């Protein structure tokens, strides 16, 4: 083991050397014919030819979904979970309004979705997933979804895909201010404030969001029936009661401080610090018959995320380094009145997570035909989990939990080749370390080619192998953790075609169709044991396959009239192909629980002068709640359609830019469930006012 570990560490050392060699060789060649190096909106002008065009060499064969900046700033009340629900083909599983919301690609689980913010992972080292309801859309300036194999370009472990989130400097001159007030149904209030200042070198920004609501919406409880009696106490009829969402209030506060310094000579420095304070009640289930005053079910979280970055850009090469820190303190309390008026602790959970992050990367263009990249990142986690439960042990209370530290290293090198403007090939090799355990090499191959320049028809294909290491809870949670778990592994294949046509100033139409096929072995699932608790096991082989389709249209209809449309559709069978655990096991050959086979979204925006009207629609097919796909009453959740509309008016007096927006959510008052027994709101309204003074 010592020899293998030494060998692998030498491999990472060689990767670091590759980064240094990329930069040193580039310095030696600087002064030759230059190439314009662009990095998003930031670039250095060097005399020469442009190596990036309509098909950037960095994106050879990649299947991705960029989220439009307009969608990110559409509504102050939206989280990234709300944005992705209507703007992508992924499945957003929500436990209710302002509660846990997770994202899953292509029939996989939320822990198979890797999430990065300014390069740093947001996935919980305890659970492996990310709560998108705690990410305000107004705090994100750039968002991109990388599907399947494409996620290997960013990180390992994304068996379904990855989500890349980033902030960006506002590029302002002088002092700027923006304030937004949102008022909605259920006494919901959302406020946003952004202060900024900038000059030729500095960009400073402060953003703050506060969201509060008792969240006591009404709904028809289909899990209960109330009897109607006659005078002789005979049941003559029944009805479903209308109830309020009980114990579902929330208060979320976020503040984001950013500072950027640009030397204008190829170096840029940045600091991003994001603090959140969340206090949320966990609403009672539709099957709860008790009085809400008899319970206190609450989760509190304080998290600080900070990243410092440096970028060094030259004509044909780039280097960067980032360092970061995450501190999370989470508290969960479940209290109950035992009948004497005193609230007693049933569960008292305290979790603390500290993560140290570091990353270096480099890119080097030999010419307009070759790009080489190298990347090495490190996340060092320190986790302390403590749960105080009622234990059957002479009536005493016992404390169980764990304290663990784990380092996670991820290194990758890639070579991208585009010999002409019709063909491209990319190879990525990645390896990761979790504690003392290395994953096998994670390879990925990407290829794309222009089928026809008329219509910009491009074919893409890719293949990769990937691994996901068990989370700390999977390994060490008490009771139930299983230190003998194996890593999940899988092969993923993608193939698709895209097109883009248009006429400048008149219309633009583009779309893509992708087929994917994924085989995942040793799928980890928590199962009940004979000892009365759950424990994770490697039991499933899962075959997830299907198609993804998206299209968008932007057209100028007439003078001052513009129509924008976009839509997504996915068909994602995700089948358990493992062996039966017992003769009674009915899960083999069935769709995985809480994975819709069909999802679809449509967005339309019609603009005229200073008016805008928007319609949003999404659809999820039925989802099974049990691995046996049982059709019993609670065995599946029905399909549902969701429609939202909004009307916006902009005003431009001399002293400020003003925007008024009225939104109707759940336009047709749809009754639906995302998770069994978790109530969801019906039709609701919001008014939003925005002011940006002109200094």
Model-derived segments and spans:
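Conserved C-terminal beta-signal and adjacent last beta-strands/turns
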Residues: 28, 207, 260-265, 457-461, ...
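Short, acidic, small-residue-rich periplasmic hinge/interaction motif at the N-terminus
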Residues: 30-73, 110
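N-terminal periplasmic accessory domains that precede
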Residues: 48, 80-83, 101-104, 116, ...
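Extracytoplasmic beta-strand/coil segments of soluble accessory domains associated
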Residues: 81-124
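Short acidic/polar hinge/loop motifs at secondary-structure boundaries
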Residues: 120-148, 479
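Periplasmic-side early beta-strands and strand-to-turn transitions of outer-membrane beta-barrels
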Residues: 197-297
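Membrane-embedded beta-barrel scaffold of Gram-negative outer-membrane proteins
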Residues: 314-334, 452, 458-460, 487-545, ...
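Gram-negative outer-membrane beta-barrel transporters
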Residues: 418-424, 515-519, 538-626
């Amino acid at each position: 083991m010592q020899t293998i570990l030494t060998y692998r560490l030498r491999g990472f050392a060689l990767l670091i050397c590759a980064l240094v060699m990329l930069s040193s060789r580039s310095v030696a060649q600087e002064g030759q014919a230059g190439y314009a190096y662009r990095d998003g909106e930031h670039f250095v002008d060097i005399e020469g030819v442009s190596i990036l065009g309509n098909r950037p060499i960095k994106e050879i064969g990649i299947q991705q979904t960029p989220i439009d900046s307009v969608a990110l700033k559409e509504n102050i009340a939206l989280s990234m979970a709300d944005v992705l629900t209507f703007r992508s083909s992924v499945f957003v599983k929500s436990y209710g309004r302002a509660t846990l919301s997770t994202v899953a690609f292509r029939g996989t689980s939320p822990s198979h979705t890797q999430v990065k913010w300014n390069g740093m992972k947001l996935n919980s080292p305890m659970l492996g997933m990310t709560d998108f309801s705690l990410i305000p859309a107004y705090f994100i300036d750039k968002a991109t979804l990388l599907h399947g194999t494409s996620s290997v370009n960013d990180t390992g472990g994304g068996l379904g895909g990855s989500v890349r989130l980033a902030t960006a400097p506002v590029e302002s001159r002088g002092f700027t201010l923006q304030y937004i007030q949102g008022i909605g149904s259920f006494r919901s209030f959302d406020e946003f404030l952004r202060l900024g200042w900038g000059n030729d070198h500095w960009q400073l920004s402060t953003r703050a969001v506060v969201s509060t609501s008792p969240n006591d919406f009404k709904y028809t409880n289909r899990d209960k029936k109330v009897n109607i009696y006659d005078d002789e106490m005979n049941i003559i009829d029944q009805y479903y009661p209308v109830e309020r969402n009980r114990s579902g209030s929330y208060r979320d506060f976020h503040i984001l401080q950013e500072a950027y310094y640009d030397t204008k000579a190829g170096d840029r420095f940045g600091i991003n610090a994001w603090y959140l304070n969340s206090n949320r009640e966990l609403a009672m289930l539709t099957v709860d018959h008790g009085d809400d005053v008899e319970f206190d079910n609450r989760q509190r979280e304080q998290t600080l995320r900070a990243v410092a970055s440096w970028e060094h850009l030259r004509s044909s090469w780039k280097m960067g380094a980032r360092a970061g820190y995450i501190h999370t303190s989470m508290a969960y309390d479940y209290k109950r009145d035992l009948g004497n008026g005193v609230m007693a602790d049933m569960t008292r959970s305290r979790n603390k997570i500290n993560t140290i992050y570091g990353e270096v990367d480099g890119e080097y263009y030999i010419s307009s035909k070759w790009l080489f990249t190298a990347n090495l990142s490190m996340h060092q986690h320190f986790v302390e989990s403590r749960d105080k439960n009622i234990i059957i042990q002479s009536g005493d209370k016992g404390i169980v939990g764990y304290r663990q530290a784990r380092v996670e290293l991820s290194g990758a090198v890639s070579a991208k080749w585009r010999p002409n403007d019709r063909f491209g090939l990319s190879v990525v090799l990645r390896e990761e370390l979790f504690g003392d355990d290395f994953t096998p090499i994670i390879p990925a191959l990407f290829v794309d080619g222009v089928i026809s320049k008329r219509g910009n028809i491009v074919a893409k294909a890719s293949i990769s192998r990937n691994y996901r290491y068990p989370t700390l809870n999977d390994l060490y949670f008490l009771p139930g953790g299983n230190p003998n778990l194996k890593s999940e592994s899988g092969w993923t294949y993608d193939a698709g075609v895209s097109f883009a046509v248009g006429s400048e100033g008149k219309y633009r139409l583009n779309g893509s169709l992708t087929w994917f096929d994924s085989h995942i072995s040793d799928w980890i699932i928590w199962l009940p044991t004979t000892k009365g608790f759950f424990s994770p096991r490697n039991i499933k082989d899962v075959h997830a396959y299907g198609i993804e389709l998206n299209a968008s249209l932007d057209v100028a209809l007439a003078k001052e009239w513009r129509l924008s449309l976009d839509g997504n559709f996915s068909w994602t069978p995700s089948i358990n192909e493992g062996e039966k655990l017992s003769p009674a096991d009915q899960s083999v050959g069935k769709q995985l629980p809480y994975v819709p086979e069909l999802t679809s979204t449509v967005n339309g925006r019609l603009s005229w002068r200073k008016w805008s009207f928007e319609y949003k629609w999404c659809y999820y097919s039925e989802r099974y709640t049990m691995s046996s796909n049982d059709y019993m009453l609670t065995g599946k959740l029905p399909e549902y359609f969701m429609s939202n509309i909004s009307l916006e008016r902009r005003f431009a007096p001399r002293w400020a830019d003003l925007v008024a927006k009225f939104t109707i959510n759940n336009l047709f008052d749809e009754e639906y469930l995302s998770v069994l027994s978790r109530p969801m709101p019906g039709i609701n309204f919001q008014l939003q006012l925005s002011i940006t003074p002109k200094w």
